[in-house]
Amino acid sequence: MKNFRSIVVLRRPIDEMWSIMRDYMGSLIDRLPDIERILELERVSASDGQTRLVNAWYIRQQIPPMLLDLLGTAELGWIDRSVWEPRNRTCAWTVEPFVLQESVSCRGATRFEQAIGGRGTRVTFEGVIELELGALNLSRILEGPVTRFLESILTTVVPRNLRSILEAAAAFQVSPE
């Protein structure tokens, strides 16, 4: 199990950051070098103000076709299930990868708080990732090092991509309807 945490402060008011991150995620991909597309699969708005979202994230990849065949997929990415709670400006989420679903568990929360005297937003992104690589039939000698290596990559890449998404959201211009 590996915990991760990232804090980003942006020069955009909290109400705007909250709405853009919840409602326009798919429009931010032009500024995300690792993400090919984000598809909203489900959106449910509850009477208490909560919004439940299910998004599919597809990554840009330079992975040999033989490796994709070995993984049993044509595309890499994950399903993001989130609950946006407006009362405390928190988004609780889980991530389910397209491959090795039984081996990877990732969950956490993103908290939005006022910053810069109300002119900005502090975003705290924290979670935990657990890898159980027994299904890969690695030798006991390799399982620990491989697990630590993958955890290290995931706990570095995920926060880096979050920073990119947040910076894209801070620069995003919402079109008048």
Where are these regions (language model features)?
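Residue-level preference for beta-strand/loop junctions
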Residues: 2, 74-76, 104
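Short strand-connecting beta-turns/loops that link adjacent beta-strands
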Residues: 48, 87, 117-118
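Beta-strand/loop substructures that line and gate deep hydrophobic ligand-binding cavities in soluble
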Residues: 53-54, 78, 83, 92-151
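Well-ordered beta-strand positions
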Residues: 9, 45, 83-85, 113
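A conserved amphipathic terminal alpha-helix motif
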Residues: 86, 139-177
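Helix-adjacent hinge/juxtasegments
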Residues: 62-86
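Hydrophobic ligand-binding cavity/cleft-lining segments
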Residues: 1-66
